[in-house]
Amino acid sequence: MIGILKKVFDVNQRQIKRMQKTVEQIDALESSIKPLTDEQLKGKTLEFKERLTKGETVDDLLPEAFAVVREAATRVLGMRPYGVQLMGGIALHEGNISEMKTGEGKTLTSTLPVYLNALTGKGVHVVTVNEYLAQRDASEMGQLHEFLGLTVGINLNSMSREEKQEAYAADITYSTNNELGFDYLRDNMGLYKEECVQRPLHFAIIDEVDSILVDEARTPLIISGQAQKSTELYMFANAFVRTLENEKDYSFDVKTKNVMLTEDGITKAEKAFHIENLFDLKHVALLHHINQGLRAHVVMHRDTDYVVQEGEIVIVDQFTGRLMKGRRYSEGLHQAIEAKEGVEIQNESMTLATITFQNYFRMYEKLSGMTGTAKTEEEEFRNIYNMNVIVIPTNKPIIRDDRADLIFKSMEGKFNAVVEDIVNRHKKGQPVLVGTVAIETSELISKMLTRKGVRHNILNAKNHAREADIIAEAGIKGAVTIATNMAGRGTDIKLGDDVKNVGLAVIGTERHESRRIDNQLRGRAGRQGDPGVTQFYLSMEDELMRRFGSDNMKAMMDRLGMDDSQPIESKMVSRAVESAQKRVEGNNYDARKQLLQYDDVLRQQREVIYKQRQEVMESDNLRGIIEGMMKSTVERAVALHTQEEIEEDWNIKGLVDYLNTNLLQDGDVKEEELRRLAPEEMSEPIIEKLIERYNEKEKLMPEEQMREFEKVVVFRVVDTKWTEHIDAMDHLREGIHLRAYGQIDPLREYQMEGFAMFESMVASIEEEISRYIMKAEIEQNLERQEVVQGEAVHPSSDGEEAKKKPVVKGDQVGRNDLCKCGSGKKYKNCCGIVQ
């Protein structure tokens, strides 16, 4: 009865039935596709593209396109996709996850939806976990796509920008998940649209989707650079600030805590540092350091805002009076205070750009994936990525023997039993794969086998270079392979002809905290209907057993007088282990979900900044945008200085000083003129004067150069402020969980404070751009420059050394090359004229 109900209500079964009908349609088309010549078969691609332009959809083309790919695969690769592979292809095309067991031909399955979706010309990304697999699949499956007239590209870390652009321009691009994410970040740090490599993200198929979207979900991709805050500059700025006098060299507004140099102060700085114009773009860093030095000396007070403890500056929480250890002021203020107090100035590395795989892959119009094990994480895929997991039936029934776990009292007893089992199977010639959780376990078993005289291969992080060769040999007679955490996914273990009747034996030395990893190990045996056996050996001293109350069981084994050589084989124990694994999986899912909620705050901000950066990059004239920024800056300044209810308390002098110092020239705006106006009327005459000055500035140089100058300023300011903001958000995130002690929801606080910080950053960007546009002297040979040269850092989740990938740098411009400013002239006759 239960079986019947299960069939009626089984959603997966319903999906399979629905797809079976489409498979029958594809089969029916075979008789008309098979007689076609190679040229006629290739011609189908053009026909499909034309039909798409006339209004048909890819869904309409699916049966015929799949039939064409099946026939082409038979001719080019000598492989004909089975019906279950067609089902897998349909599930992928619909934006779902195809769970297909090991050896069922996932790579061939992917060619069906890849071809269909590549017909749109928008690009399809096939994502793999490492470059070896990307190259293998691109060369093998690429033959099929190229036969059908589509272009195939491969995107590798070592490639130049031009090679990457070519790879992404292809109809189908094979790449690793890391490289896709880093290219996205680098594109959004670029200064010229010609430097960008990616097209809009259309459709991705992720191989081993659980590994990328679940196991690596919490690992952010980071491009970081040494923060260009030389400690030396802090020392110089600090020494200079000590010589300044209040009122004469700087003005301090107690209410707004705003401190800035006066004209005298600016002149003093220019003399002290032997420069002509403090507001020149070349001196951005110097001005920033002086301003932060001023804030450190005038605004920040020892034992009120911070304390000096054990040679470190520790912030004091203004609300609770508690010390906030580990928190640092952003934008270099912390280093300025360190210089003021004479303690060691810490040089921070700065995150220039960051994104998690969760957020990167959610940007695709359509996303799908394939793996042998995804059903256990179905809830996560559905809730976070909006993908259903469809379990595709195997082509032949699975006849593998999955035996119940054997539980030993101690680790020693367990390993002795494992080695004995391996030796016995090795004598019979049966190939054995031993799965371990840690590298040290694999090396311990290796030593024990060496003592017994059993030849074997070890596959772990230390020798992954030979991964493919070791896996290829693992199915031959008498082979013994020890693999850590199922390294070598993506390559099948093919059985030698002389062991086809016994199959592969898989031995697990302990249960992983995730059932999925155990299932991956099991799935190595019994591929494509082959025989095979799987057996897990556990001990009461294993981490999972220790964490989830095995004391009772240990006591029971003692009472029964069981020694190390006697295991217990019990369904009850297996169930207890499985429920422990479910609990751990639940905890991990909650952690990933929480990470996503926090990361979403930065995601929304990142999308706003990157979208505006893109607009700036593609825009020919930023004048309108900059005028809008000036208007906002003036309105904010007016509001700040006239916020008191009583007119006499308005700080009109402060407003005039601010405008003359930052935006206008002395005498452009007079105090008595503004006093006659209401606050809402003050902005208009100021903005008119600003535009007048802007027009004068434009007349001083050619139009092209003015436009490039605007872009230089906007990029420099936006990128500097954005990287500082990411840094500040990092620091906010580190300490936010402590708010929970005050009965406050940390996530809500993070969202609110993050939004306030973002608004403050936008205001700061607008103000600084306005100031540089109005005050900076313009040089003839302006060039856009990256704020910081970054390098890609992908923190390794398994504690190995972090992988570092350099940002691809642009080529040097030759004197006879076209100028990068977009003028159409040769470099020597344009921006290179002065050099």
From Swiss-Prot:
It comes from the Bacteria. May bind 1 zinc ion per subunit. The lineage of its organism: Bacteria, Bacillati, Bacillota, Bacilli, Bacillales. Part of the Sec protein translocase complex. Interacts with the SecYEG preprotein conducting channel. Has a central role in coupling the hydrolysis of ATP to the transfer of proteins into and across the cell membrane, serving as an ATP-driven molecular motor driving the stepwise translocation of polypeptide chains across the membrane. Monomer and homodimer. Part of the essential Sec protein translocation apparatus which comprises SecA, SecYEG and auxiliary proteins SecDF. Other proteins may also be involved. GO terms for cellular component: cell envelope Sec protein transport complex; cytoplasm; plasma membrane. This is Protein translocase subunit SecA. ATP binds at residues 85, 103-107, 492. The keyword Cell membrane applies. It is an enzyme of class 7 (translocase). It comes from Bacillus cereus (strain ATCC 14579 / DSM 31 / CCUG 7414 / JCM 2152 / NBRC 15305 / NCIMB 9373 / NCTC 2599 / NRRL B-3711). Its EC number is 7.4.2.8. SMART domains: SecA_DEAD (SM00957), SecA_PP_bind (SM00958). Residues 788-807 are annotated as: Disordered. PROSITE patterns: SECA, SECA_MOTOR_DEAD. NCBIfam families: PRK09200.1, PRK12904.1, secA. Belongs to the SecA family. It is found in: Cell membrane; Cytoplasm. GO terms for biological process: intracellular protein transmembrane transport; protein import; protein targeting; protein transport by the Sec complex. Its main location: membrane. It catalyses: ATP + H2O + cellular proteinSide 1 = ADP + phosphate + cellular proteinSide 2. Zn(2+) binds at residues 819, 821, 830-831. Its cofactor is Zn(2+). The keyword Metal-binding applies. CDD domains: DEXDc_SecA, SF2_C_secA.
